[in-house]
């Protein structure tokens, strides 16, 4: 049987299987997890200091910070009783973010540049107080024996509840303070930058009491995962949903919400890393100081999945101060903005694959795609341009693949004679076949290797188109006004069916089993149905790729002295 045909069947079936596996992955509804009892967790004054987790180490495992600094003599911080009662919610607004916070937790976060729907005005709400699926980011302090701020403990230093980045300003700075008993205070500064989704949160502990103060900072992301609808009509279910983290030693790792505690609570001390919660196109992340170690913990708190950093811990002597700073990212997976953060491994949140080699291929493809967009100013034309460049680059492999298949077809009559000569003696038939291949210098796998080299590239391109938030709600032309939504009139899927059908007719199939031939007739229809509900950008890729493949097939047939009309007639028999 024609080797090109065999591996074309294999490729199509493999694509279908992988697509179905990826659709089924990470989107099954997760049952509400059973709360896990705390084990050896520091008895903090703050009731929410640390989420319960299995096998959590004792307070001694929290990384210790460096030596604190002396409090400047000019400091005018005075000791006041600990604040009681809930602090009023504060709203911070930049050109890209609107945050609702209480000084300790970011309760709501709206992404002002990203509407929920193509024609809508409501922005995407990434963090939310929604009762069914709450999702927030918290930075607090915990201690076994020293006073720490609890919920509502931080108060804005400036009057008012609304702070907005003014025109002409690039930075919005809003300070908060907690005044504890006996002269201990913690000053917290929120800083928002124009055009940035990274929020700087800096804490300074000032001890003007007569005793040493001990405590550690914790930063956590907590959410009740949204149950994603099953099926091809929901692009959000294509993507990875869960926690990811990075360490210089182990690199990028991830844990899906549906398998959140299957491998335990992590409990790993890391310096120079970060932790994040991912969903389709958007994510939140805590990025601590590169030189300060934290204990990374995954936990479940009732129905909530928690990703948390604990530490560093501080011992602040009387008259001393200590500080720590972290960035909270609340926003899209925009490659250009992630690069500006200069955080190692953060580009992996654009989750092209959990495998490094596939992620590298995906990053390279997006680099080309983004440069094409900067020239063409349209993501649809950029996709077409990328496919054309890929086809040109892979043309030598396609030529080698077809050449190998053409050579095999020329020897089909001799193979048929060998089969007739040796009848049911498969061993002698195979031995004679291999001798023929050796004599005529035929590589039976010659059509396979080029295909195997191309497949990782096309798989990576598939995930580039799924994952890239840059394509979200981007138009192409005419009826395609959103490349991440399905084709409203199914024009591209129908074109895809026609191209696949024509490709089948132009693919020589000498000696193909009648049952296999009948199965192959249904492949265009099967793929057409699958593509009908996929994002239009993906279907556009398949249509252009298939159309160019059809032209190359026609050209190769003529180059090797074969006639397309004869192949079509042979396949029709």
From Swiss-Prot:
UniProt-listed CDD domains: 5TM_YidC_Alb3, EcYidC-like_peri
Main location class: membrane
One GO-annotated biological process of the protein: protein insertion into membrane
Pfam family, one: YidC_periplas
Keyword annotations: Cell inner membrane, Cell membrane, Chaperone, Membrane, Protein transport, Transmembrane, Transmembrane helix, Transport
Family recorded in the similarity comment: Belongs to the OXA1/ALB3/YidC family. Type 1 subfamily.
Protein name as it appears in the record: Membrane protein insertase YidC
Species in which this protein is naturally found: Xanthomonas campestris pv. campestris (strain 8004)
Record lineage: Bacteria, Pseudomonadati, Pseudomonadota, Gammaproteobacteria, Lysobacterales
């Amino acid at each position: 049987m024609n080797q090109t045909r065999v591996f074309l069947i294999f490729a199509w079936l493999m694509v279908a299987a992988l697509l179905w596996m990826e659709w089924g992955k990470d989107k099954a509804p997760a049952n509400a997890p059973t709360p896990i009892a705390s084990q050896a967790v520091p008895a903090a004054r703050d009731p929410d200091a640390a989420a319960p987790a299995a096998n959590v180490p004792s307070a001694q495992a929290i990384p210790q910070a460096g030596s604190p600094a002396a409090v400047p003599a000019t400091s005018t911080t005075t000791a006041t009783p600990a604040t009681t009662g809930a602090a009023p919610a504060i709203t911070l607004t930049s050109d890209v973010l609107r945050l609702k916070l209480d000084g300790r937790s970011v309760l709501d976060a709206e992404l002002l540049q990203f509407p929920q729907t193509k024609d809508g005005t409501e922005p995407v709400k990434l963090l939310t107080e929604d009762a069914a699926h709450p999702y927030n980011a918290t930075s607090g302090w915990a201690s076994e024996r020293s006073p720490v701020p609890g919920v509502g403990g931080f108060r804005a230093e400036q009057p008012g509840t609304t702070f907005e980045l003014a025109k002409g300003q690039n930075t919005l700075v809003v300070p908060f303070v907690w005044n504890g008993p006996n002269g201990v205070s913690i000053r917290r500064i929120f800083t928002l930058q124009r055009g940035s989704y990274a929020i700087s949160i800096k804490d300074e502990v000032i001890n003007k009491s007569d005793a040493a103060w001990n405590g550690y900072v914790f930063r956590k992301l907590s959410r009740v995962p949204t149950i994603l609808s099953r099926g091809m009509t929901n692009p959000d279910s294509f993507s990875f949903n869960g926690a990811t983290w990075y360490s210089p030693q182990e690199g990028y790792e991830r844990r899906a919400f549906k398998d959140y505690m299957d491998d335990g609570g992590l409990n790993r001390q890391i310096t120079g890393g970060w932790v994040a919660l991912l969903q389709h196109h958007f994510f939140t992340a805590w990025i601590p100081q590169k030189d300060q170690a934290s204990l990374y913990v995954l936990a479940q708190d009732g129905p909530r999945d928690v990703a948390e950093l604990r530490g560093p811990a501080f011992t602040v002597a009387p008259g001393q101060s200590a500080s720590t700073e972290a960035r909270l990212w609340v926003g899209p997976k925009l490659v250009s903005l992630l690069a500006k953060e200069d955080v190692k491994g953060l580009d992996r949140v654009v989750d092209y694959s959990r495998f490094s080699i596939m992620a590298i291929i995906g990053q390279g493809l997006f680099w080309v795609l983004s440069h094409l967009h900067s020239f063409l100013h349209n993501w649809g034309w950029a996709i077409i341009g990328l496919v054309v460049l890929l086809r040109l680059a892979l043309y030598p492999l396609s030529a080698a693949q077809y050449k190998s298949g053409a050579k095999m077809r020329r020897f089909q009559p001799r193979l048929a004679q060998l089969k007739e000569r040796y009848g049911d003696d498969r061993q002698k038939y195979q031995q004679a076949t291999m001798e023929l291949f050796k004599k005529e210098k035929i590589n039976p796998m010659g059509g396979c290797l080029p295909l195997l080299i191309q497949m990782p590239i096309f798989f990576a391109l598939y995930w580039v188109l799924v994952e890239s938030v840059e394509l979200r709600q981007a138009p192409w032309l005419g009826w395609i006004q959103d490349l991440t939504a399905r084709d409203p009139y199914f024009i591209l899927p129908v074109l895809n069916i026609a191209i696949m059908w024509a490709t089948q007719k132009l693919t020589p199939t000498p000696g193909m089993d009648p049952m296999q031939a009948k199965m192959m007739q249904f492949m265009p229809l099967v793929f057409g149905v699958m593509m009908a509900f996929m994002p239009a950008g993906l279907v556009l890729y398949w249509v252009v790729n298939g159309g160019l493949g059809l032209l190359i097939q026609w050209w190769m047939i003529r180059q090797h002295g074969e006639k397309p009309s004869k192949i079509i007639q042979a396949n029709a028999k």
